[in-house]
Amino acid sequence: MDWDDILARSASTGAAPDLIFREEVQKAVLACLSLQEFFSQAVLQGGTALRLFYGNPRFSEDLDFVRKEPGQPATLTAHTAQIGPFLERQFSFIDKAEAVIQKQTATLERISVRLRGTDPSANLRLNLELAAVPSRSNAPKILRYPPINPAVRVESPSEILADKVTALLFRPYLKGRDVWDLHYLLEEHKLTIDWIMVAQKAEDYGHQTADLDMRMGSASRRLAAEGPSALAQEMPRFLTPATLQQYAAVFPAMAAATARRITKFQQGRERGLGL
């Protein structure tokens, strides 16, 4: 792929060249890892999974992985040396690509992929993280990245929803991307929140679960109060102008609808319905 291909896709979709390029790098890294059988041990999660495999219109930033099974050994940093040369072969306009280990502990591995190109927009940093927690629901899927079209093991939408709810309950701040993804999964995919999986996720990440009901109430109120501004502040970075134009006016309604779903979930739990 050359830079003209990036510019042509940008012109046809309305997305900024740097967004198009980042997504192509994400695909290339996933292909590289798949060829090294990384997905026999690990699972893609988060916003990139929603974007590439479940039709979410928002672009994503980094690549996040978890282990395929509880207690199963998995390593991301072992593949560091292969990523840079693979990317240089995929993109003709890249002068240098390298992957650098930033963190390697028993609970988290992080790699920073750095690219430098002839065009300033081709200078990019992409973070990869592998958390030592298990996936609860996943399957292999084919990534559209010809001619390789690699198999990538991906969390199910229900598990991604559980991840997003867990983040909503325990993160000390609200991400606009999470509000968008929650609305997308709850309203567009019509999913229901799996309470058992949320509790499992909370425990996996070392959180106390005794106060989940209280946290759900707080999260619902925060969504309603802060969700519209979080969406307005963050989503212009991750949507095409045409998509943003359609959704910007309904950001308050999106946040309110998502807050109502969280409240309904909490009330159902209090009545023992296990929604």
Predicted regions and their residues:
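Structured mid-to-C-terminal alpha-helical surface segments
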Residues: 1-42, 53-56, 68-275
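Glycine-rich beta-strand-to-loop/alpha-helix junction loops that act as flexible
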Residues: 45-48
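Anion-coordinating catalytic cores for phosphoryl-, nucleotidyl-, and glycosidic chemistry
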Residues: 60
